Design a protein with these regions (language model features):
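Short hydrophobic/aromatic beta-strand micro-patches
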Residues: 9, 53-55
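Short, surface-exposed ligand-recognition loops at beta-strand->loop->(often short) alpha-helix junctions
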Residues: 9-20
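Active-site-flanking beta-strand signature of metal-NTP-handling nucleotidyl enzymes
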Residues: 2-8
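Broad gene-expression machinery/nucleic-acid interaction feature
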Residues: 5, 49-51, 88
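Absolute protein N-terminus
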Residues: 1-2, 98
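Short acidic/glycine-enriched loop/turn segments that link adjacent beta-strands
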Residues: 44-48
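N-terminal secretory/targeting leader peptides
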Residues: 40-42
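An amphipathic, aromatic/His-enriched active-site/gating alpha helix that lines ligand/cofactor pockets
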Residues: 20-38, 55-93
Length: 98
């Protein structure tokens, strides 16, 4: 099993807007091999940070979901709402050991 963590630095003052978009978007993220997903906004650390975490059966399941979501018009429309509110981001992928 793997854990994928996507961290985004949001534009200043946009956390409230992003929160509504994320709540809507998590309902669209359904894929084979996906176990759970969570979204976090910062309490400490760099201001206006959004973290999206999800766990997958395997790297292959995650890669397939990326390809499938990229071809999904509903997901593309949701993503287009989110990206103007984001300054930058990065992804970390971990092997789950317990």
């Amino acid at each position: 099993m793997i854990l994928v963590r996507n961290s985004f630095q949001l534009k200043f003052g946009k956390a409230k807007d992003v929160k509504a978009i994320i709540k809507d978007g998590l309902t669209k993220l359904k894929a084979p091999g996906l176990h759970e997903h969570r979204a976090y906004l910062d309490l400490t650390g760099p201001f206006y940070t959004l973290v999206l975490e999800n766990t997958w059966d395997s790297m292959a399941a995650f890669e397939k979901a990326l390809a499938d979501l990229g071809a999904n018009a509903e997901w593309q429309a949701w993503y287009a709402k989110l990206m103007p509110l984001v300054e930058s981001g990065h992804r970390e992928i971990y092997t789950v050991i317990s």
